Amino acid sequence: HLGIARRATNGIELRVHPTLIPAEELIANVNGVKNAVLVQAHAVGPTLYYGAGAGAGPTASAVVADVIDIVRDISYTEDGAGTIPQLAFEALTNVPILSREEMTTGYYIRINAEDQTGVLADVTTILSRAGISIDAIMQQPRLKDLIPIVILTDPVVESKMDEALAQIQALPVIHGEIVRIRLESLDN
C-alpha cells in the first residue's frame, strides 16, 4: 500500500491504497517490514526516509507517539480549530480534505471480455465520453473463452472513472469484476 498526502488545486488529497509505481523509483524497492516516506520539496527535490515499519519495536514506538500526540493536544478548542500540538501554532488557512471521488490519479484497468468485434471500441468510447485519456492499451491472449484487456489511463478525477467503469461493467460482453489499481508517477 502507498499512503499519499498531496496538495491539489482544490484541497488536500489524503489516501492509502494499493498503488502501482514505476519500478525505477527508489521507494519501489522498499520490501518486507521496512517502510519509507518520500517527500517532494521545492528546494531539494525528492528525499526518501527509510527504516523499520513493523514488528514489536516499531509498533510500540508508534503507539507511544500516538499517546503523546493525544496528551499534547491540550490546545484543542470547541469550534474544532485546534493548534498543531507539536508545533503550537494555528493553521494559516483552512484547506479542505478532498473526498475519494474528487481525487485525481491514473489507473490500471483489467477487463475480461468476450472475443467479439467492437468490444474494444465500446470500451474506449465509454472512456472517451467520460473524458478519460488512454495512455496505453493491450489486448492479452485469449484466456479460456475471454480476452483480457489491459488499459493504463492518464490521471483523471475518480468520480469520472467510477461512472465509466460502471457503464463498462454493464456491457453484456464483460465478465467478472473489472480490476482497478491506481497509478502514481511520483513526479509531482
What is the role of each PLM region?
Residues 1, 15, 38, 48-50, ...:
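Structured core elements
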Residues 1-29, 34-36, 55:
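Substrate-binding/catalytic subdomain of NAD(P)-dependent oxidoreductase enzymes
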Residues 7, 19-23, 42-45, 53-56, ...:
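Short, glycine-/Ser/Thr-/acidic-enriched flexible segments
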Residues 28-72:
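Gly/His-enriched, cation/cofactor- and phosphate-binding structural elements
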Residues 62, 67-188:
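A conserved regulatory-domain signal marking ACT and ACT-like small-molecule sensing domains
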